[in-house]
């Protein structure tokens, strides 16, 4: 009528009595809660003074640690007591702690998942059967970290994108708890693609030369730019075009040269267009800076015909290069 170790199953207590004399009047079964110390009458079996064997049973469904004793009384009011060994019953699932501390916002700093688990009996500070394992699985269902009662994992470059990790805690009687967390990890800067060329003269190389004095650039944050197999990106957060003269940077506030995005979107894009022919800007160069919602940044320097004219101190007709 006992278990020698923890069990997840209900425990059946069988009480057998024998009286070959005046007969068994009744048997009382008491349960002692080893956690609280409370003794409770859980069985009152009236046998009316019959002789011979009697069999009674009680099923323990509430989890906990218990032992039982039975008191048998015959028709002459003689009593005898018998005790059981301890019963260890665990119905509670493990509790996973720490998932809520994982950064789930877009970031370019590798997030870490650090979790632990407990296996207390419900409503107590008494440990039940205890933890067998804590495991972390990636979105490909591959095991990436494991421990007996805790586990941690820091994302790698191959985890770039939006990824859901599953945490699984198992106790020693087979109860399993699961939790999940979705990380958003972006380490690929936005891309800037345009019509500029590389100009070479007298051994001097000038990259980003706008030969027609028109700034025409496409900016996006698509996942094809990632070399790590990202499944999603944070999207463009801002695009700003500057005129740079010496150490002075001046923002060009036009609909085609300045934009701030409200929320992350993998497929966000912006097309920069600026006709220097219409402005006759006297600047050293132009600078495009774009950032995504994870904090990655891309810069691009562009030069115009006027820049080359100043650099080489010669006459350059528009469209000559």
What are these regions (language model features)?
Residues 58-65, 154-162, 273-283:
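Surface-exposed, short loops/turns at beta-strand junctions within beta-sandwich domains
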Residues 43-51, 142-149, 261-266:
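Short beta-strand segments within Ig-like beta-sandwich modules, predominantly Fibronectin type-III
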Residues 72, 169, 289-290:
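Conserved structural position at the C-terminal beta-strand
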Residues 68, 165, 286-288:
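Hydrophobic beta-strand segments within extracellular beta-sandwich modules
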Residues 17-33, 119-138, 212-245:
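Solvent-exposed loop/turn segments flanking beta-strands in beta-repeat/beta-sandwich domains
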């Amino acid at each position: 009528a006992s278990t020698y170790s923890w069990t997840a199953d209900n425990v059946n207590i069988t009480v057998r009595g024998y009286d070959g004399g005046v007969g068994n009047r009744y048997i009382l079964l008491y349960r002692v809660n080893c956690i609280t110390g409370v003794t409770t009458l859980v069985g009152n079996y009236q046998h009316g003074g019959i002789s011979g064997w009697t069999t009674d049973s009680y099923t323990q469904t509430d989890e906990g640690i218990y032992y039982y004793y039975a008191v048998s009384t015959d028709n002459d009011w003689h009593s005898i007591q018998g005790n059981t060994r301890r019963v260890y019953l665990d119905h509670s699932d493990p509790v996973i702690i720490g998932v809520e501390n994982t950064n789930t916002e877009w970031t370019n700093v590798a997030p870490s998942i650090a979790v632990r688990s407990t296996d207390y009996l419900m409503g107590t500070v008494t440990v039940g059967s205890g933890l067998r394992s804590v495991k972390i699985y990636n979105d490909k269902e591959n095991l990436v970290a494991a421990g007996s009662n805790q586990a941690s994992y820091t994302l790698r470059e191959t985890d770039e994108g939006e990824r859901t990790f599953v945490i699984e805690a198992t106790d020693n009687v087979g109860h399993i708890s699961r939790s999940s967390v979705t990380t958003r990890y972006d380490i690929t800067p936005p891309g800037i693609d345009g019509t500029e060329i590389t100009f070479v003269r007298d051994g001097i190389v000038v990259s980003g030369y706008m030969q027609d004095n028109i700034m025409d650039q496409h900016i996006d944050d698509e996942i094809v730019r990632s070399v790590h197999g990202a499944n999603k990106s944070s999207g463009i957060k801002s695009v700003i075009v500057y005129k740079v003269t010496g150490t002075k940077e001046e923002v060009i506030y036009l609909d085609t040269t300045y934009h701030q995005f409200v929320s992350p979107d993998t497929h966000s894009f912006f097309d920069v267009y600026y006709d220097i022919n219409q402005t006759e800007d006297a600047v050293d160069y132009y600078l495009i800076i774009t950032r995504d919602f994870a904090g990655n940044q891309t810069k691009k320097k562009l030069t115009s015909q006027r820049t080359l004219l100043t650099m080489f101190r010669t006459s350059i007709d528009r469209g000559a290069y």
